């Protein structure tokens, strides 16, 4: 994969979960992109037309196959994996990536909502955070993948080939957090975050560090995907 030859495909699954810092990073790096909403009834694009696919969060999970958009995303990410198009899965996107690779997605014993430190085996790629978590389900590390990060309650990141799946939201911004907190007041109260006010108060203080960590993660993903693609192309070119 050579950044800039093809655009990045961003799959957005609900209006309140936009690509946020991911788009900011792409613009800063000069990488073209297209945002495709999965709820507007349009046909899913061919992942082969893109340099990589980023799949964002969703109110649904991969097991909600009664939802046409979920089935469509499973097919699209499955096609990307089959065609060796790198996939960056963020929360729901990471769950879908795990599912198509043979992992399991299940209800988490407790939802993770808010800023959380994670245990990471590769801080150069995935810093310890804190990262913004907002999920009620969790994935397992699929067969053949390497678990990179975790909390006590969930696997937080895995990689396999050019693909990276994470359970947290590196793309989140203060504005995105405010939207989620307003919609999930009841869940936040159950977890001791009264009306989301604590979360809203602390998020601006972490904005700069979160942006730096997110850009490091995105850069590392792109570098690994690019190196793998170039090595594969070189190996193919050497065959007679």
Predicted regions mapped to residue ranges:
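Flexible gly/pro-rich beta->alpha loop and the following alpha-helix that scaffold active-site loops
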Residues: 23-88
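Catalytic nucleophile loop
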Residues: 79-104
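Residue-level signal for inorganic ion chemistry
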Residues: 26, 91, 221
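Short Pro/Gly-enriched coil loops immediately N-terminal to beta-strands
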Residues: 109-114
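N-terminal beta1-alpha1 ligand-phosphate binding loop
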Residues: 8-26, 39
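Glycine/Thr-rich phosphate-binding loops of Rossmann-like dinucleotide-binding domains
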Residues: 18, 63-64, 98
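Amide-donor transfer/coupling interface in amidating biosynthetic enzymes
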Residues: 10, 106, 120-240
């Amino acid at each position: 994969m050579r950044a800039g030859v093809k655009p990045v495909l961003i799959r957005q699954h609900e209006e309140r979960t936009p690509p946020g810092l991911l788009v900011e990073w792409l613009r800063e790096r000069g990488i073209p992109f297209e945002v495709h909403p999965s709820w507007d009834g349009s046909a899913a694009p061919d992942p082969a037309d893109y340099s990589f696919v980023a799949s964002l969060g969703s109110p649904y999970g991969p097991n909600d196959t009664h939802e046409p958009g979920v089935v469509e995303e499973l097919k699209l990410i499955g096609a990307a994996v089959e065609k060796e198009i790198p996939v960056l899965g963020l929360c729901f996107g990471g769950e879908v990536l795990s599912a198509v690779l043979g992992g399991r997605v299940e209800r988490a014993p407790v939802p993770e909502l808010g800023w959380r430190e994670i245990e990471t085996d590769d801080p150069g790629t995935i810093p310890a955070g804190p990262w913004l978590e907002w999920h009620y389900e969790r994935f397992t590390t699929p067969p053949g993948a390497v678990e990179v990060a975790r909390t006590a309650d969930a696997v937080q990141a895995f990689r396999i080939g050019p693909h990276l799946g994470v359970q947290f939201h590196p793309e989140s911004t203060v504005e995105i957090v405010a939207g989620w907190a307003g919609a999930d007041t009841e869940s936040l109260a159950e977890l001791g975050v009264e009306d989301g006010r604590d979360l809203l108060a602390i998020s601006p203080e972490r904005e700069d560090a979160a942006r730096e960590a997110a850009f490091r993660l995105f850069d590392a993903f792109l570098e690994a995907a690019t190196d793998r693609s170039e090595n594969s192309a070189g190996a193919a070119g050497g065959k007679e």
